[in-house]
């Protein structure tokens, strides 16, 4: 998967927030904010192809968590990003 072109992570009033830049982005009814872990993952894979295992390995490297926990967390964030339409 890959972050869809035009979506960027910005700091909005101290919060890591996904914003759609440019024509053709979806109509947002709310801001999409990310916690520190999700923002770290976003920044790590921005402009790259990635999968759940890529995200899990990043979590393991950064936080030293076990593989099962990392895969569960990585799948949850990837599923959420797919659901809201910011990755494809």
Where are the model-predicted features located?
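Acidic, low-complexity/disordered tracts enriched in E/D and polar residues
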Residues: 1-40
């Amino acid at each position: 998967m890959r972050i869809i072109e035009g979506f960027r992570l910005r700091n909005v009033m101290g919060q890591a927030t996904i914003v759609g830049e440019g024509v053709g982005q979806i109509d947002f009814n709310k801001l999409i904010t990310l916690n520190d872990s999700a923002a770290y993952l976003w920044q790590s894979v921005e402009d790259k192809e990635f999968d759940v295992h890529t995200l899990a390995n990043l979590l393991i490297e950064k936080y030293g968590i076990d593989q099962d926990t990392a895969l569960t967390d990585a799948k949850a964030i990837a599923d959420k990003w797919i659901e809201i339409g910011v990755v494809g």
